[in-house]
Swiss-Prot record:
Gene: ku
Organism: Streptomyces griseus subsp. griseus (strain JCM 4626 / CBS 651.72 / NBRC 13350 / KCC S-0626 / ISP 5235)
Entry-linked PANTHER family: NON-HOMOLOGOUS END JOINING PROTEIN KU
InterPro entries: Ku70/Ku80_beta-barrel_dom, Prok_Ku, SPOC-like_C_dom_sf
CDD domains: KU_like
Protein name from the UniProt record: Non-homologous end joining protein Ku
Biased composition (Basic residues): 351-361
Region annotation Disordered: where it falls in the sequence: 252-395
Amino acid sequence: MRSIWNGAISFGLVSIPIKLVNATENHSISFRQIHLADGGRIRYRKVCELDEQEVSGSETGKAYEDADGTMIPITDEDLAQLPLPTAKTIEIVAFVPADRIDPLQMDAAYYLSANGVPAAKPYTLLREALKRSNRVAVAKYALRGRERLGMLRVVGEVIALHGLLWPDEIRPPEDAAPDGDITVRDAELDLADTLMSTLGEVDMDSLHDDYREAVEELAAAKASGESVPPAEPEDTGGEVIDLIAALENSVRAARTSRDDEGAGGDGGDMADVHPIGRGAKASSKTSGQSSGKAARTTKTARRTTHRTPTGKTVTRSGDSTAEKSAPKSSGAKKSTAKKSTAKKTAAQKTTARKTTAKKTTAKGTTGTTAAAKKRTSSGGGTAKKSASSRKRTSA
């Protein structure tokens, strides 16, 4: 970076040679004045108001205008004879906490660079001293023909100089305050706090000059002969007189904007995931319905076993036997009936529930009746044995 001023930092008895370079740059758009008739650029010439003659740069000097309008010529030799100790020196006058500096005083910013190898050690000493003390240095320096006030602080590994306005150059704020005694309610303060929390923080590096970019795009479009569509006016939502309503609308708009930004970041994933989720739910729902139908069919089969013509007592004992004796054929038939019924129900969704129940009932009845017959036959054998034993006893 090109230096704009060379001098030294006066730090007590220590003198640190430095170079002053601009820390900022101006990116604003500047327009030229042209003649509308032919597009020619308009130039300004220096003309003496007394003889109305054009004056060149070599014939131009400077003067101090007195209160009554009198011009008092001042030459460069006159200025060079002034006792100005800060002409080539940044003179540190005090070290103060950073919060002692009013941001209203902040002006242009510069970087201070050590000028030469011998300046590196004292430069580093001052930088580290400012870091450890958490203070800033207040200094005076002369630049572009006037003495200025400045503040030295550490930025990374560099000492920066901020130009400051003199205290008498800051206007008092009382004239800008609202007139009258205005009361703010707690509800309004709460909504304002909510709005500030909703807006959140911002990455300063992401901020840019939208107007400058729009002007550059406009100039490029006109240079290529393209037409630029007019910008659509923003919807401000109309005039809101009620402060509470305005705050509520602001909070709502901030939340909507934040939600839209969050949804825009992963909208593609949401579009891919949703159909799969619905398909999975439908599949699980279908299987659940099939299982429910199979369970209802099995219950129907169990209820039907109570209506067999064998009798109430036999039917209950047969039903009990079929449930308890897993190795018997009737239990196996019931398991097969349950599985086949579940498979048929899952494969054929349009089959009526009553038809499935009838088929299962028939199979369940057959198995239960067979078990009942076996129980009845075994019961008959037991009765015969009891009769023969009675005959022997009577004999």
